């Protein structure tokens, strides 16, 4: 889990645009965050399995 101070820091608008980075809105994970959902791959998978993300289905081919 990310520290609370890091989550708050990520929400603030940075002084320079290049310093901005994405964090998961649920757990605060800084890596592998999907911009469209604002979630990391782990939280995205859990929410998709529970059906909390409308329109997201498991792929099969």
UniProtKB/Swiss-Prot annotation:
GO molecular function, one term: rRNA binding
GO biological process, one term: translation
SUBUNIT field: Part of the 30S ribosomal subunit. Contacts proteins S3 and S10.
PANTHER family xrefs: 30S RIBOSOMAL PROTEIN S14 (PTHR19836), SMALL RIBOSOMAL SUBUNIT PROTEIN US14M (PTHR19836:SF19)
Protein role: Binds 16S rRNA, required for the assembly of 30S particles and may also be responsible for determining the conformation of the 16S rRNA at the A site.
Family to which the UniProt record says this protein belongs: Belongs to the universal ribosomal protein uS14 family. Zinc-binding uS14 subfamily.
Name assigned to this protein: Small ribosomal subunit protein uS14
